[in-house]
Structure formats: structure tokens, C-alpha cells
């Protein structure tokens, strides 16, 4: 038997579920056994991106003792768009402080 953690977070809360599973258990089986899909019905496991210790991983991946399985939420904004918005905000702040450049 191995000990793992299933992790998921929303903007409101973060959940970590400790779980003990067989050494032959796959990621998808562990997630289903954890009960997290009942706690968060918005998780669509067939479309969700999952990882182990912040590294993207396939659902059929094997597990090791101490693994932290993370279920990632979809992005709310395109990363390029987010960078552009941050850059514009930074430029406006510099202009307000008189650091225009």
C-alpha cells in the first residue's frame, strides 16, 4: 500500500484528501476513490488536466508513495492576454508616478 494526496482548489477553498491505495493503482482510479468528484461535480475527469507534483501527467499513470495528485481548473483567460493586461497596467502605474518611459 502507498499513501498519496489528491488536491483540488477553487477560488474559495483548497482541498487535500489523503488516501491509501494499492501500489498498482492508477491516477484515475485514485481520483475516483477519493470522493473528490462527488465534492466537486464541476470536475470533468475526461477533460481535466491532472498532474503529480506540478508536472502534467496522464490519467493512466502509475503512482508512487508520497505522490500529490493535482487536478487543475481550466484557465479563465488566455495567458498571452493576461500578460498584455499586466503590461498595460504597469505602464499606466509608471505614468501616474511620473516614470514614463
Curated annotation (Swiss-Prot):
It comes from the Bacteria. Belongs to the UPF0125 (RnfH) family. PANTHER family: UPF0125 PROTEIN RATB. HAMAP family: UPF0125_RnfH (MF_00460). This is Protein RnfH. It comes from Coxiella burnetii (strain CbuK_Q154).
